[in-house]
Design a protein with these regions (language model features):
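Generic early N-terminus positional signal peaking at residue ~5-7
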Residues: 6-8, 23-24, 70
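Beta-hairpin "wing" of winged helix-turn-helix
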Residues: 70-79, 86-87
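C-terminal regulatory/oligomerization modules of transcriptional regulators
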Residues: 1-16, 90-144
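Alpha-helical residues within the helix-turn-helix
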Residues: 52, 69-70
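Residues in soluble alpha-helical coiled-coils and helical-bundle/repeat scaffolds
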Residues: 41, 45, 74, 106-107
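Short, hydrophobic-biased segments on the C-terminal half of alpha helices
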Residues: 65-66
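N-terminal helix-turn-helix DNA-binding core of bacterial DNA-binding proteins
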Residues: 19-60, 83-92
Length: 144
């Protein structure tokens, strides 16, 4: 039995949707990537801000950002010498359960809560991204 071109096209389209959803879920299957999404859901940030808040090195943060970007979960924007990352709202609006997980399930988790507390302390510290990179000022901010 043969499929019509239209039937084949519909199956192919549905398969692509499933593959894209799986790619999204795979990108969110690592603690640090969920931490990044959690932080970016509060504010657009650059790599140096993420690495200092999360306590990770630049290569780890960049690797995780790359995977999130490949899955189209985040967007990047270059501003002068800095690259800033922010949430891509489209997949979160398309798959509401992703936003529900972030909003409801993770808000009381100690790691994510700690990241948000660190972000808030950083934002109120008046330390700029340039100062984070050029000095150890971030180390002077009590984070715990």
């Amino acid at each position: 039995m043969y499929m019509s071109k239209n039937e084949y096209s519909n199956i192919k389209e549905r398969s692509l949707k499933i593959m894209n959803l799986l790619k999204t879920l795979k990108a969110l299957s690592h603690l640090n990537r969920i931490r990044i999404v959690n932080l970016l859901s509060h504010k657009e940030l650059c790599v140096c801000e993420l690495e200092n808040i999360m306590g990770l090195n630049q290569s780890n943060v960049s690797r995780h950002l790359g995977k999130l970007q490949e899955a189209d979960l985040i967007l990047r924007e270059k501003k002068a010498q800095w690259v800033y990352y922010k949430i891509n709202e489209k997949p979160f609006n398309k798959h509401k359960f992703l936003q529900n997980i972030l909003n409801e399930e993770l808000e009381d988790h100690v790691v994510y809560e700690g990241d948000v507390i660190k972000l808030q302390k950083y934002l109120t510290s008046e330390v700029s991204c340039e100062e984070l990179t050029d000095s150890n000022l971030f180390g002077n901010i009590k984070m715990n």
